[in-house]
Regions:
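Pyridoxal 5′-phosphate
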Residues: 1-213
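A short, hydrophobic C-terminal helix/tail in secreted or cell-surface proteins
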Residues: 214-218
């Protein structure tokens, strides 16, 4: 805890709901990296506020217009958070569910044939999805084996696996188990140098919690 004074740590902890007490099991410390996440109290308040509003966005009334303004502001804030000025933002039930949809859409829309590439470093959110949709689209799934010593994969690992007819590539930006990250920019450049039209899907769920994101640069 050398990075935090006791006062700062308490201030941070105070921002989250149920940090040290479960509403069902009583006192405990939430220390789970794959079965949920702590929620900011401000998020709980905001979610409750908007859940109570009966109007849908896209209608011709004051409430609907206000909701549309909130959505546009949220998208602008998200662009700043992720370091980009282009692209689209959309939401879903979970990161795993969204990644499955992205892999499905990429595999379905890519040119026929070729292969799909992922690594043993990845979370099942992309790894299992890529294997499934490779089989569904009659493509070979090729695994990039991670380095046990480094605990991750490198651009060279991908370069040795990617082929000119690689259609879809999945990359894990940071491990949800160890927090170890990869050089996404170098890996993406390695992929593009061999298969310029390959669709790259990045699982950045854990990375965004630990590091500053710069989507435009990576």
């Amino acid at each position: 805890m050398d990075h935090f004074t006791p006062d700062l740590l308490n201030e941070i902890r105070e921002q989250f709901a149920f940090v040290d007490k479960c509403p069902f099991a009583g006192e405990r410390i939430f220390f789970e990296n794959a079965g949920g996440a702590l929620t900011l109290k401000s998020v709980v308040e905001t979610s409750s506020k908007f859940a109570a509003i009966p109007d849908n966005q896209g209608r011709s009334n004051a409430a609907s217009k206000a909701l549309m303004d909130v959505i546009q502001k949220a998208k602008s804030d998200a662009a700043s958070l992720f370091g980009t000025t282009k692209g689209q933002f959309f939401v879903g039930e979970s990161g795993t569910e969204l990644l499955f949809r992205l892999v499905r859409n990429a595999a379905s829309s890519a040119d026929m044939g070729g292969n799909m590439v992922g690594s043993s470093f990845e979370h099942p959110a992309t790894r299992s999805a890529a294997k499934y949709w490779a089989a569904e689209t009659k493509r070979k799934y090729i695994n990039v084996q991670h380095d046990d010593t480094l605990g991750h994969v490198t651009a060279d690992h991908y370069s040795n696996t990617i082929t000119p007819d690689t259609r879809v590539v999945t990359i894990l930006h940071a491990s949800p188990v160890t927090g170890i990250s990869v050089d996404l920019k170098k890996i993406s450049e390695a992929v593009r140098s061999i298969s310029p039209e390959a669709l790259i899907i990045v699982d950045g769920v854990q990375y965004c919690l630990l590091y500053t994101s710069d989507a435009a640069d990576e």
